[in-house]
Amino acid sequence: MSPWVTAEELHAAASRVTGLDDFGPDDYGDGLAELIASYERDADLTPRGEKVARAMLRGALAARLCSEAGWRAYPEHAQVRLARPLFVTGLPRTGTTALHRLLAADPAHQGLELWLAEAPQPRPPRDTWADNPVFRYIQAGCERHHVEHPEFMGVHYMAADQVEECWQLLRQSMRSVSWECLAHLPSYSAWLRTQDWTGAYRRHRRNLQLIGLGTERIDCRSSCQHSSTWSAAM
């Protein structure tokens, strides 16, 4: 029986979406292999589930491509100082999203909007977003999701310009609890518990520097994951 997906297929799909081909150092290949194997072995996915899982994996790789391109184009990102960041963390479904979005509404703070998490780049002026093709592509996907799953809007509202959790940046390293929150992946979970998170958070930090280039506001981030990987996050 042929595999449900291969790493090569996912890389090719991410390159087609972005027009980019430099994925950076291979510090994520082991995690990608573990995820592909665990989805196949453990998750018992339906055809629709396989489609969703492929899209999430492709999205993580596409975001990785955008980050690598951004770091090359804006080497000055490395000089951005992340001063006194705020981290919101806690158990899922306990109000952390509401608190995070409330804090991010302060003009002195900056959150991580969904479209910039999925396609990291220096944050453009907000009045240009509606004309940005990447923003429009991601917003169109959100609107389709609202139509197909209207009940989800009351659980966790999503829009391209809405502040989101920063675990999406950790997905670039294929080390994130988000995968196991959305599918039954016990073998991946067991592997994840043995991992050093330092490299994943180093990449996370570089992404925040890239996105925050040209601003001096306090970063406000949220993820239930930070409570279990706190030492690496610091």
For the regions a protein language model found, what residue spans apply to each?
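Post-Walker A helix-loop "phosphate-sensing" segment adjacent to the P-loop in P-loop NTPases
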Residues: 105-115
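Aromatic-acidic/polar surface patches that form glycan- and anion
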Residues: 3, 46, 50, 92, ...
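PAPS-dependent sulfation machinery
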Residues: 118-222
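Phosphate-binding P-loop
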Residues: 76-83
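Short, hydrophobic/aromatic alpha-helical segments in well-folded domains
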Residues: 87, 98, 207-210, 233-234
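Glycine-rich phosphate-binding P-loop
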Residues: 87-107
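Long, basic/Gly/Ser/Thr-rich N-terminal segments
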Residues: 1-73
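Long, well-ordered mid-to-C-terminal structural blocks that present hydrophobic/aromatic surfaces
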Residues: 218-234
